[in-house]
Curated annotation (Swiss-Prot):
Disulfide topology: none
Pfam families: Ribosomal_L27A
UniProt keyword rRNA-binding present: yes
UniProt entry tagged with the keyword Ribosomal protein: yes
Role this protein plays: Binds to the 23S rRNA.
UniProt keywords, alphabetically: Ribonucleoprotein, Ribosomal protein, RNA-binding, rRNA-binding
PANTHER family with a match to the protein in the record: 50S RIBOSOMAL PROTEIN L15, LARGE RIBOSOMAL SUBUNIT PROTEIN UL15M
Name used for this protein in its record: Large ribosomal subunit protein uL15
InterPro entries the UniProt entry points to: Ribosomal_uL15 (IPR030878), Ribosomal_uL15/eL18 (IPR021131), Ribosomal_uL15/eL18_sf (IPR036227), Ribosomal_uL15_bac-type (IPR005749), Ribosomal_uL15_CS (IPR001196)
Subunit structure: Part of the 50S ribosomal subunit.
Family: Belongs to the universal ribosomal protein uL15 family.
Length: 156
């Protein structure tokens, strides 16, 4: 006994109606159970997309175009907050004497990639750090400098 031997129980299935195979079949000839004329009698009259409005000009064409989308040219940054840098210092993962670069942050798993890194100013920083990144928020700049550190913007 295997899957190829399995069959449905007697009477459990019904053969589908063979339409359009001549008048003698009882379901054939001219209109084949579809009624007479109209959209639903034609081929391809199945379910239409949800936005189809029956031939009326659809809403998205009636409403004027609006706005601008710069998505293809957007600059995406991997972000790290100063509180994360402070936590790494507290856990002695980072060394105060070594500069913090995008490569260091990527190696530690703070950011996924070192390609473009932006430092944001959430949290507090108490130790002086030399931080190098592609971009800094204004608050991050202030907090790093207040702690006695330095900020360097590296090229893309």
């Amino acid at each position: 006994m295997d899957l190829s031997n399995l069959k449905p129980a007697e009477g459990a299935t019904q053969a589908g109606q063979r339409l359009g195979r001549g008048e003698g079949s009882g379901r054939g000839g001219h209109s084949s159970t579809r009624g007479t004329k109209g959209q639903s009698s034609r081929s391809g009259s199945g379910t239409r997309p949800i936005w189809f409005e029956g031939g009326q000009t659809p809403l998205f064409q009636r409403v004027p175009k609006h706005g601008f989308n710069n998505a293809p040219f957007r600059t995406d940054y991997a972000i790290a907050n100063v509180k994360r840098l402070q936590r790494l210092l507290d856990e002695e993962v980072l060394d105060e004497d070594e500069p913090v670069t995008p490569e260091v942050l990527a190696d530690l798993g703070v950011v996924r990639t070192a390609n473009r890194v932006k430092i944001l100013g959430d949290g507090d920083l108490f130790d002086a750090l030399e931080v190098k990144a592609h971009a800094f928020s204004e608050s991050a700049r202030q907090k790093i400098k207040q702690a006695g550190g330095s900020v360097t913007v590296v090229d893309q």
